[in-house]
Swiss-Prot record:
Assigned keywords, A-Z: Ribonucleoprotein, Ribosomal protein, RNA-binding, rRNA-binding
Top-level taxonomic group: Bacteria
GO cellular component: ribonucleoprotein complex; ribosome
Name of this protein: Small ribosomal subunit protein uS8
Keyword Endoplasmic reticulum: no
PANTHER family associated with the record: 40S RIBOSOMAL PROTEIN S15A
GO molecular function annotations of the record: rRNA binding; structural constituent of ribosome
Subunit structure of this chain's protein: Part of the 30S ribosomal subunit. Contacts proteins S5 and S12.
Pfam families: Ribosomal_S8
Keyword Membrane: no
HAMAP family linked to this entry: Ribosomal_uS8_B (MF_01302_B)
Length: 134
């Protein structure tokens, strides 16, 4: 069966992995997923990620995401998909949502790449609001 929301699937794997206290989770690779992981790593929500070969012959690519914890608690307390395949959400740079009074981030896909809300405001660009994390 085809996956309708690959980014939502990755965010769910991260959420489930942290609830189960896993060190890392594995997800299929895609360019968008890598760009979102770059933002999460820059903002300090994950330790890092690496690309791996999957399958018996290594014909598929996967991403191993190294989860981060602080004093035994997950670094990501909440992660939610905002723009979904059935309902896209777009925002200008001035209207980007502020998550938890600035304690969290919004991940935005812009013409300049996938950025956090702070980076998008700084560069004065808007775009599709992909997810919110805190």
């Amino acid at each position: 069966m085809a996956m309708t929301d690959p980014l939502g699937d990755m965010l769910t794997r991260i959420r489930n992995g942290q609830q189960a206290k896993k060190d890392s989770v594995l997800t299929p690779a895609s360019t968008l997923r890598v760009r979102v992981l770059d933002v999460l790593q820059r903002e300090g929500y994950i330790r890092g990620y690496s690309e791996e070969a999957l399958g018996a012959k290594g014909q598929h690519k996967g991403i191993r995401i190294e989860l981060k914890y602080f004093e035994g608690q997950p670094a990501i307390r909440h992660v939610a998909r905002v723009s979904k395949p059935g309902r896209r959400v777009y925002s200008g740079s001035k209207e980007l949502p502020i998550v938890r009074n600035g304690l969290g981030i919004t991940i935005v896909s812009t013409p300049r790449g996938v950025l956090s809300d702070a980076e998008a405001r700084e560069q004065n660009v808007g775009g599709e609001v992909l997810a919110e994390v805190f």
